[in-house]
Amino acid sequence: MKMMRNVLVLAAMIGLCLFGASCARRNEQPTSANVTNEQYSWGTYRADFDSTMFLLDKAVRNACARARLVKREQTFSGNLSFYKYQDVDGIEVKVTIVELKEGGVRMKIRIGSMGDKESSQKLLLAIDDELRLLVTTPAAM
């Protein structure tokens, strides 16, 4: 009886390990040269940029306008910018930009109430494209 229980516990542990290994997934999305320290946790996508706050702020506004997001709220406070957008389905998109003390800028993206990793990555890549465009064409500033 005791041996049967040990076998069942061992089988359950092996099944749990296999299930956990199948749930782990690597990030297949290509990262950009401008973006460092990308992380996704608890519905918020976070990335650091080697750029200025002014350029990243402008890139966020351009990318969201290109995605036809409607601006609902805009807040500036010292080294922090906060935007709340809404898409055509009524889903909120929150973007926070914070200037870091050691240089660079940190951006946080949250799409919807629970977060959406794939959409956040797509928005991050669109913002990075806009930032690259702003850096290469100085007349666009």
Protein language model features and the residues they cover:
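Ser/Thr-rich, low-complexity intrinsically disordered terminal regions
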Residues: A24-M141
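Bacterial N-terminal signal peptides that target proteins for export
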Residues: M1-A12
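C-terminal motif of bacterial Sec signal peptides marking the signal peptidase cleavage site
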Residues: L18-S22
